[in-house]
């Protein structure tokens, strides 16, 4: 017999086998269930998912378009900060979780839900990211995590148990040839993990990669673009007409110009996919303490990071950039990966980020070719930290080269003291004395 009256649950619903069974199981447990789907740019048959959820027994179904919010409030701040985890991962999955969680909490308030449920596994990062966000935005919310509930995971020990339950509940299951890995997609990236990828020495099959062309399929001629940034945010994309290498470099007004923030990002996605840009295969350290292997395709994000970092070299003060790199970039990347986006520390770090980006105004010319993002030039008409005449070997300006003698003398005082000390210890200038000793 079905229990009744336990309360209202908002379920993060994907339309797949797991969350469809969770939806039916929650109803069996006596909950009224509202199903929620976020459109963050993934390829999905949302209409079919809605019909399926309502047929299973969901009281209501919400589909919320969060693409613009995702780009403007998560992706572009990450671009400003040059966010990266462990030197390689551009945080595509992590970036989507705060915006999905916020959308869910909005519906929780509208529908007066006492509970929220998700289908995250008990070994992954996403359970942490979602639940931290839920509690930060709605401290009194109660979370149901079936894959951490013994009653659920003991009953559904494998896919066969889920399929049997789906048949019992008349849940339609779209049968396809099962791919031996799992995926998670949004407009920033797609991730592949689990299954055959759990062996870190297994080469991913060519047909796994969904978004980005293999290098053998990419054009053999470069495509030239210019990205214009305002305070570190991309505000214009110019796609230049095909030209020979003998013509003058293109200007920002030479070609098709796109200024809508969403369209800029989506167009860069298409260009990067076409030219084989943005694939990685890594082993990373999860927040919960285990290592995992992940393969990622991050097309537009790869181009934007290269362009943004290059422009910063032209327009950002040396010490400001060093502080941003050592503090803001590393801390915001950890905040994103570990699920602390909605926190006091993120607000503080982001306020520092915004200050660091005040001078990041200008344009970067790029060439896209065979998996490479090649910088061909950069320009800013408002920021004047770079002075070509000042650094020229062929001109004398206000830079007094004789002053360098004093600079070297002062900076080398401590080096001379260090050198005197090592000579006093009997050390020499031989290689075995001056270089690091190997154990």
Each model region followed by its residue ranges:
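Nucleotide-activated chemistry modules centered on ATP-dependent adenylation/adenylyltransferase
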Residues: 2-12, 17-439
């Amino acid at each position: 017999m079905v229990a009744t009256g336990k309360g209202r649950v908002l379920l993060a619903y994907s339309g797949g086998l797991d969350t469809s069974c969770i939806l039916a199981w929650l109803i069996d447990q006596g909950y009224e269930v509202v199903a929620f789907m976020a459109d963050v740019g993934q390829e999905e048959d949302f209409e079919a998912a809605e019909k399926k959820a309502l047929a299973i027994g969901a009281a209501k179904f919400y589909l919320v378009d969060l693409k613009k919010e995702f780009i403007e409030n998560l992706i572009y701040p990450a671009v400003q900060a040059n966010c990266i985890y462990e030197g390689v991962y551009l945080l595509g999955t992590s970036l989507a979780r705060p915006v999905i969680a916020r959308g869910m909490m909005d519906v929780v308030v509208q529908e007066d839900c006492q509970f929220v449920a998700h289908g995250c596994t008990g070994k992954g990062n996403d359970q942490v990211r979602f639940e931290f966000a839920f509690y930060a935005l709605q401290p009194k919310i109660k979370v149901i995590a079936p894959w951490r509930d013994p009653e659920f995971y003991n009953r559904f020990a494998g896919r066969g148990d889920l399929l049997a339950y789906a048949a019992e509940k008349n849940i339609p299951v779209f049968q396809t040839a099962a791919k031996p890995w799992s995926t998670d997609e949004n407009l920033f990236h797609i991730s592949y993990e689990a299954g055959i990828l759990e062996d870190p020495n297994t080469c991913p099959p060519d047909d796994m990669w969904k978004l980005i062309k293999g290098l053998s399929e990419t054009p053999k001629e470069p495509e030239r673009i210019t990205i214009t940034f305002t305070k570190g945010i991309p505000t214009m994309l110019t796609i230049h007409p095909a030209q020979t290498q003998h013509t003058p470099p293109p200007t920002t007004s030479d070609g098709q110009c796109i200024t809508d923030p969403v369209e800029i990002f989506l167009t860069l996605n298409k260009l990067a996919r076409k030219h084989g840009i943005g694939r990685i295969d890594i082993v990373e350290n999860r927040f919960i303490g285990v290592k995992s292997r992940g393969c990622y395709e991050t097309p537009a994000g790869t181009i934007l990071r290269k362009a943004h970092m290059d422009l910063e070299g032209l327009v950002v003060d040396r010490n400001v950039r060093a502080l941003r790199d050592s503090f803001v970039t590393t801390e915001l990347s950890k905040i994103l990966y570990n699920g602390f986006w909605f926190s006091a520390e993120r607000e503080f770090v982001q306020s520092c980020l915004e200050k660091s980006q005040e001078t990041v105004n200008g344009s970067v010319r790029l060439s896209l070719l065979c998996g490479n993002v090649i910088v061909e030039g950069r320009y800013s008409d408002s920021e004047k930290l770079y002075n070509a005449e000042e650094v020229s070997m062929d001109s004398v300006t206000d830079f007094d080269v004789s002053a360098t003698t004093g600079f070297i003398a002062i900076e080398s005082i401590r080096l001379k003291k260090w050198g005197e000390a090592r000579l006093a210890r009997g050390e020499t200038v031989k290689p075995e004395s001056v270089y690091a000793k190997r154990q």
